[in-house]
Amino acid sequence: MDHAEQGPDRPGVDDPGRGRRIGIDVGSVRIGVASSDPDGILATPVETVPRSKDRGPDAPDIRRIADIVEEYEAVEVIVGLPQTLRGERGKAASIATVFAKRLRRKVDPIPVRMADERLTTVTAARALRESGVSARGQRPVIDQAAAVAILQGWLDERSRSVNAGDVGGDVQLPEAGQ
């Protein structure tokens, strides 16, 4: 799917069902990675991967993310698509889209989707600051926190879609407390 012209993906009929999802926040220097539990309810941080200057199909950053996808036995990868508040795209969106295309080729047949990530880094920084993490202390984890926000947003939307019957297959989310 070419994301150069269309908006971000949304959970829907092509949902792969139960399984872990990986969330990715692509930056120009670092990539934040998060994972969900197998039931797709809660996103947690995994690691921060340095961006590689190599933009080839076997670049170290792409390889590391592909290894994480395999290690976690992910059924879906969600890459944040940064847009302005008006839904416009800039350089950061182009970087994320190109990265997603490269990753898609590496992890095929696992689907790689783009999710709206407006303000996730701002929200993550605010949450870290409110939890007492200094600005300097945020650097190593801000990308992971943004990846968690991207993935949690996807999981929450997926849960609403499942409950509304918009997601195909035999997808059933467990009730709270199970």
Swiss-Prot record:
Biased composition (Basic and acidic residues): 1-18, 50-60
One BP term from GO: rRNA 5'-end processing
Main localisation: cytoplasm
GO molecular function, one term: nuclease activity
EC number(s) per entry: 3.1.-.-
Cellular compartment(s): Cytoplasm
A single cellular component GO annotation: cytosol
Gene3D superfamilies per the UniProt record, alphabetical: YqgF/RNase H-like domain
CDD domains per the UniProt record, alphabetical: YqgF
Enzyme class: hydrolase
Pfam families to which the protein is assigned, alphabetical: RuvX (PF03652)
Region (Disordered): 1-23, 36-60
Stored InterPro entries: RNaseH-like_sf, YqgF, YqgF/RNaseH-like_dom, YqgF/RNaseH-like_dom_sf
Family: Belongs to the YqgF nuclease family.
Protein name per UniProt: Putative pre-16S rRNA nuclease
Organism per entry: Rhodococcus opacus (strain B4)
